[in-house]
Each structure stands twice: as structure tokens, then as C-alpha cells.
């Protein structure tokens, strides 16, 4: 409990986002992933979430990832729906990436048109750490993805990518905020949408460079078809 309390709901602020507050209030259990100092996980860890119910259902998922100094790991989170019901899913992921650590985080959604999903990902990076975050939406109803990433130590870098392939009446929003609190950090964002029919997509990316964050490098690209 003391270990979890050190990290849980520290960067996922309940007073800044209503969905995060709702998830924090309603979440009954969650997933804790802890990678100790200098441990390098060679194989990708896959986490599969399957929505299964005989009635309409709301679910609230919570994930806490703690990677200590020099740790390396890759994670693939997959969302699927097994039943033709109305689902409302909220998800909050908090990831702490220690000094010289490396995190690859992939989030894939392939549900159905009755699924409503809001996913908030919060990442905190220490000095010389590396993060590769990829969010992929293939089949859904309405989806809103949010990424808040903050640099706490110099020399860190992140690569944040998104891919959306949607048709019919699918709706997909991606919102990002990269907070350069210290200097000598690099952020790269690339989001691509392929839309057909009545599908709608939106992308809003913000980069905040704090006073004194010298030699910041940031690139943001959004391409659509």
C-alpha cells in the first residue's frame, strides 16, 4: 500500500479532468506493473481487455506502471468487445519512467460501434529516459484519447504516434499535451487519420515549454486522408 500510495493518482489529477475523477472514484481494482532498477524485459507484455456482458455495461480500468532507473519494457494493451451491447469504458494509465529507463507503450482498440471509450494516459519522464507511445484505433463507436506527458529530467525524449482507420459513423479524438518543464528534452508527435463515409476525427496537440527549458526540441505532425 505504501508503494502504491507513492505513485497512485499523483500525475493523474482528479481536479483537472472529469473522466479521471470519475475513474478514480469508481475503480474497484486495477493493474500494477513494476519493473525494478536495471531490469530489462525482453519480450513484449500483452494485456487484453475484453468487454463481455449480457446487459449494457460501464467499466472503469486503472493501470499503474512504475519503471525504476535503467529499466526497459514494452507493453501492448488491446481492447476488444465480445458482445453486441452498449459499453462505456473509462481508462486511466499512469506511467512513471525513471532515469535512463525506456518504455514502449502501445494501445490498440478494436471494439464495435456501440462502444464509448475515454482513455487518459499520464506519463512522467526523468533524466535521459525514453518513451515510445503509440495509440491505434481500428474499430469503435466514439473514442476520446488523451495523453499528458511531462519531462522532469534533462536529456529525455518521447515519440508519440497515433493511427486512426475509421468509416461509417466512427468518431475518434486524440488530444495531447507535452510539458517541457526542463531543458535539453526532445518530443516528436505524428498522428495520421484515414477516414471514410461519415467518420469523424479530431486532433489537438499542445506543447508547453516552461521558462528556462533551454534547448528544447519539439516536432508535431498531423496528416489525414
Describe every region a protein language model picked out.
Residues 2-225:
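Conserved beta-strand/loop scaffold segments within soluble protein domains that form the structured core
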Amino acid at each position: 500500500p505504501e508503494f502504491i500510495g507513492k505513485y497512485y493518482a499523483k500525475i493523474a489529477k482528479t481536479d483537472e479532468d472529469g473522466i479521471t475523477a470519475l475513474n478514480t472514484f469508481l475503480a474497484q481494482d486495477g493493474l500494477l506493473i513494476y519493473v525494478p532498477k536495471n531490469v530489462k524485459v525482453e519480450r513484449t507484455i500483452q494485456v487484453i481487455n475484453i468487454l463481455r456482458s449480457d446487459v449494457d455495461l460501464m467499466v472503469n480500468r486503472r493501470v499503474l506502471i512504475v519503471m525504476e532507473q535503467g529499466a526497459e519494457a514494452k507493453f501492448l494493451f488491446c481492447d476488444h468487445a465480445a458482445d453486441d451491447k452498449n459499453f462505456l469504458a473509462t481508462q486511466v494509465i499512469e506511467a512513471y519512467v525513471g532515469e535512463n529507463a525506456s518504455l514502449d507503450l502501445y494501445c490498440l482498440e478494436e471494439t464495435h460501434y456501440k462502444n464509448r471509450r475515454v482513455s487518459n494516459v499520464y506519463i512522467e519522464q526523468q533524466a535521459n529516459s525514453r518513451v515510445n507511445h503509440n495509440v491505434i484505433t481500428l474499430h469503435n463507436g466514439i473514442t476520446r484519447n488523451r495523453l499528458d506527458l511531462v519531462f522532469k529530467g534533462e536529456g529525455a525524449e518521447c515519440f508519440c504516434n497515433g493511427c486512426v482507420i475509421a468509416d461509417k459513423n466512427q468518431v475518434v479524438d486524440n488530444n495531447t499535451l507535452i510539458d517541457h518543464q526542463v531543458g535539453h528534452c526532445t518530443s516528436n508527435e505524428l498522428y495520421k487519420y484515414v477516414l471514410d463515409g461519415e467518420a469523424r476525427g479530431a486532433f489537438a496537440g499542445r506543447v508547453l515549454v516552461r521558462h528556462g527549458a533551454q534547448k528544447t526540441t519539439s516536432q508535431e505532425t498531423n496528416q489525414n486522408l
